[in-house]
Design a protein with these regions (language model features):
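Short loop/edge segments at beta-strand edges and connector loops
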Residues: 1, 16, 57-59
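A conserved short coil-to-beta-strand element within the FAD-binding core of flavoproteins
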Residues: 1-11
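Short hydrophobic core segments
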Residues: 2, 20-40, 48-49, 99-104
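Short, conserved acidic/polar surface loops in the N-terminal third of protein domains
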Residues: 7-9, 37-40, 68
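Acidic, glycine-enriched active-site microenvironments
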Residues: 9-15, 22-25
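Glycine-centered tight beta-turn/hairpin loop motif at sheet-sheet or coil-to-beta transitions
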Residues: 16-18, 92
């Protein structure tokens, strides 16, 4: 583990646990901060700042969205359900990929991609029926099958578990 880094006219000195290493050049490979349990720290960013390098604010990217407990409890029955989606960030960035409901929230390619463009406090818009105009679809189904329930009509386009969950949410 590197404890500190100093610079002088001859290069750099790295102080390790009980040892020192000198080098003419220094490469700072900071890694990310997303996995502190695996040893991720801000040390590399601090060293970069120490030597006057510009360090941009960090944020998570390519990560799932976790949900608050009340919403998570309502949607946990959907864990493992994957649906095609179009997901849009507040800045207008759009991804057309699968969305996966998990035991912790939302994941899948669409969510992982959009997470790099999302900022805390911003909204994302998720279209779970990106290939149809829902109003037109419902009008046609109502005309062709006037006695069919909304649940059965939606189950023609969405996984049954998702339709049942949406029905429970009201």
């Amino acid at each position: 583990e590197i404890l500190s880094v100093t610079r002088d006219d001859e290069g750099y000195t790295l102080v390790l646990n009980g040892d020192e290493v000198s080098a003419n050049k220094l490469v700072i490979a900071s890694g990310g901060l997303s996995m502190p349990g695996l040893g991720a720290t801000p040390f590399g960013y601090k060293v970069a700042e120490q030597f006057g390098l510009k360090v941009l604010p960090t944020r998570a990217g390519l990560v799932p969205f976790t949900l608050h407990k009340p919403m998570l409890e309502q949607l946990q029955v959907l864990s493992g359900v994957s649906v095609p989606s179009v997901i849009t960030a507040q800045d207008g960035t759009v991804f057309r990929e699968s969305l996966l409901f998990t035991h912790r929230g939302l994941s899948g390619p669409a969510v992982l991609q959009i997470s790099s463009y999302w900022q805390a406090g911003e909204f994302v818009s998720i279209n779970l029926l990106p290939d149809i105009d829902l109003a037109d679809f419902l009008d046609v189904q109502r005309a062709e099958h006037p006695n069919q329930s909304l649940k059965n009509t939606l189950a023609m386009q969405l996984p049954k578990r998702l339709v049942e969950c949406l029905q429970q949410l009201g």
